[in-house]
């Protein structure tokens, strides 16, 4: 599976501290006039601000949610009608077995092809089955192998992800990284007796995604020898994100004494 490159780091949010309100009639500085990507961090632009700067990282993964299995049925006869009859008989058995298992028509695709081979006719049919439950997939494949003869060939399953899975995983990694950074900042403020305020800057500094494990390169050279679990592991996608956040820091509010 070819994954698209992740976008570059970008600033998600930058809020001006409350102390800067009321400056509408004052000229802005050269640093403030720069684009967001070139402006210094809030702590540098506002040296008097009370802030905490933290980073957060996260890595998430998702197993494939689809599997494609192809069942091929073929027959070669001197008469075309006999070749068709032989293939269609087994084809009907396969489709009926799938219907009994509750498969919807949109998850099953059937194609047929007949051609001349010297002085005979060769009929071939393919049944492409999309599975969402891998346990049911194994049971059905084992059942068809037991019930049908050697002229029926069942391909190994091909595991894949539905469209949009990689982008959804990238977003999830970023959100978890932000949550981890927020928890870190919260613990720091609790430790020093302060109150964590609103975020002033949220920036994703690094994001990446990949398929399979980094140590699976040897297994990928022999795809025909992989077990089902190894194939699922090899098709699993991963995403990592690293964020930088600046939070406002507030002092602990003192409780008023009631007379």
Swiss-Prot record:
Instruction: Cite the entry's keywords alphabetically.
Output: Cytoplasm, Nucleus, Phosphoprotein, Transcription, Transcription regulation
InterPro entries in UniProt: IRAK1BP1, SIMPL/DUF541
The keyword Cytoplasm is assigned to this record: yes
Q: Which GO terms describe its biological process?
A: immune response; positive regulation of canonical NF-kappaB signal transduction
Q: Where in the cell is it found?
A: Cytoplasm; Nucleus
Q: Modified residue Phosphoserine is at which positions?
A: 55, 61, 63, 234, 241
- GO terms for MF: signaling adaptor activity
* Gene Ontology cellular-component annotations: cytoplasm; nucleus
Which residues are recorded as modified (Phosphothreonine)? 236, 246
Family listed = Belongs to the IRAK1BP1 family.
Function comment? Component of the IRAK1-dependent TNFRSF1A signaling pathway that leads to NF-kappa-B activation and is required for cell survival. Acts by enhancing RELA transcriptional activity.
Record text about domains: The disordered region interacts with HSPA1 and HSPA8.
Q: Any idea what this protein is called?
A: Interleukin-1 receptor-associated kinase 1-binding protein 1
Gene from which the chain derives: Irak1bp1
């Amino acid at each position: 599976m070819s994954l698209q490159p992740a976008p570059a780091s970008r600033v998600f949010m930058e809020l001006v501290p409350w102390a800067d309100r009321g400056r509408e009639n004052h000229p802005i500085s050269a640093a403030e006039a720069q684009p967001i990507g070139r402006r210094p961090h809030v702590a540098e632009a506002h040296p008097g601000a009370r802030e905490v700067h933290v980073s957060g990282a996260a890595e998430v993964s998702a197993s494939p949610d689809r599997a494609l299995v192809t069942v091929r049925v073929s027959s070669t006869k001197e008469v075309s009608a006999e070749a068709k009859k032989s293939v269609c008989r087994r084809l009907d058995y396969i489709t009926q077995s799938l219907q009994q298992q509750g498969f919807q028509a949109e998850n099953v695709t059937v194609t047929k092809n007949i051609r001349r081979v010297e002085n005979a006719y060769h009929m071939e049919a393919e049944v492409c089955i999309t599975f969402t439950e891998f346990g049911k997939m194994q049971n059905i494949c084992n059942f068809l192998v037991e019930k049908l003869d050697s002229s029926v060939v069942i391909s190994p399953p091909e595991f894949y992800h539905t469209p949009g899975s990689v982008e959804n995983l990238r977003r999830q990694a970023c959100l978890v990284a932000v949550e981890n950074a927020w928890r870190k900042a919260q613990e720091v403020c609790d430790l020093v007796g302060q109150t964590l305020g609103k975020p002033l800057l949220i920036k994703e500094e690094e994001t990446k995604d990949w398929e399979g494990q980094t140590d699976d390169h040897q297994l990928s050279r022999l795809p025909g020898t992989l077990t089902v679990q190894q194939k699922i592991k090899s098709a699993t996608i991963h995403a990592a994100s690293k964020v930088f956040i600046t939070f406002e820091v507030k002092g602990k509010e003192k409780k008023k004494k009631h007379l």
